[in-house]
């Protein structure tokens, strides 16, 4: 008994030492999307705080392309020591279904480290659209089938898939118009009439009266737009949320993941960071790495069904 206990204690020493020594050098956080997007801003907020807390630089590296798959694969192939991390989100979980010939399995080859937060999208219409509520919009769309254009940030994008889910649940016929660049200019001009967009991209136009917010996509109202109802108040069961978190290559030491999880949860609980995230429409979401892994798998399955049912193809 004493020998077994002693062996266990000795085995724990390297693991404890490894956690204490981490990070031993610069840490790269790969953001698989362009600089300036909400995911990039979230990564920089968290990275700066981790740099201060752990006394090593956490550097953001934007590695874009293929719907986020290029940056994600670079993390899959990285040395699993905790010094290369991934800023990941809902699109990563969706890509598992959207892309048929990936060179990696996101669910199996990226270890969940820590969740950062979740963010509603907002259903917005051009101010010329006569509908002022979701029920009015549904009635208007059904009276004008195939005459209303729904913009998105690309075929297979989060905004596209959220819109397709709305179409499936309400029976409306909207014409999807994907954009490689921003959809906001054409939404403002009326070339497209409705978009499921990020709050951060739309809020200044909502407050300026150029766009009308009909609903947010989460089950609870947003603190940023508390007067705007949820879609679920009118479309029973509709719930959709963008989310962000940190991942690492599989086989990253468990003690490193635990340390990062603890540190990231502390970062997102800090009042200043919470306020900065709130400005982006992001609500902190804290959970263990294991719980985060279950959450990601559930999201991949849920949105995979929508993608298959609507026969959505990535660009």
Regions found by a protein language model. Give the residues of each.
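N-terminal export signals
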Residues: 1-19
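N-terminal (or domain-start) structured segment
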Residues: 13, 17-107, 147-149, 170-196, ...
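An extracytoplasmic/periplasmic, membrane-proximal ligand-sensing/linker region
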Residues: 24-26, 169-170, 254-315
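Hinge/capping helix and adjacent helix->loop/strand transition within the periplasmic-binding protein
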Residues: 77-83, 97-182, 231, 236, ...
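A ligand-binding cleft/hinge motif common to bilobed small-molecule-binding domains
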Residues: 92-101, 165-169, 194-227
